[in-house]
A protein has these predicted regions:
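Rossmann-fold NAD(P)-binding glycine/threonine-rich loop
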Residues: 68, 73-127
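Glycine-rich phosphate/diphosphate-binding loop of Rossmann-like nucleotide-binding domains
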Residues: 1-71, 84-95
Length: 127
């Protein structure tokens, strides 16, 4: 249950950041949204019990951003300088701090693809 939990969403895009923030508020979470103009983003994120990274910047969320025992959800999808697929979270840096974290690849992207396929089939059947 996320009711009353402190949640920080990094990113304010119309695709992920804003919709996720609204869904979390509807479930009575206390939501803070960070963006490129946020002052002390690391401190703001470190206050979160749940951190949602949707900034579109490869491995920008470092250990300084994550509170001990936080849940980290990485929605980002990026390619780093070496051509490797990665998320917005530096998974190796935060894995022993966070209580749980979704990896990239292999995290929420798989769920997104499944839901998209489900909606596509549903729309096709409705025709």
């Amino acid at each position: 249950d996320i009711k009353g939990k402190r949640v920080t969403v990094v990113g304010r895009s119309l695709v992920i950041g804003k919709p996720v923030s609204m869904l979390l508020m509807k479930r009575n979470a206390t939501v803070t949204v960070c963006h490129t103009k946020t002052v002390d983003m690391a401190g703001t994120c470190k206050n979160a019990e749940i951190l949602v990274a949707a900034a579109g910047s490869a491995r920008m969320i470092k250990k300084e951003y994550v509170a001990d025992g936080a849940v980290v959800i990485d929605v980002g999808i990026n390619v780093d300088d070496e051509g490797n697929l990665c998320g917005d979270v530096d998974f190796d840096a935060i894995s022993d701090i966070a209580a749980a974290a979704t990896p990239v690849p292999g995290g929420v992207g798989s769920v997104t693809t499944s839901v998209l396929a489900k909606h596509l089939v549903k729309a096709a059947m409705a025709r």
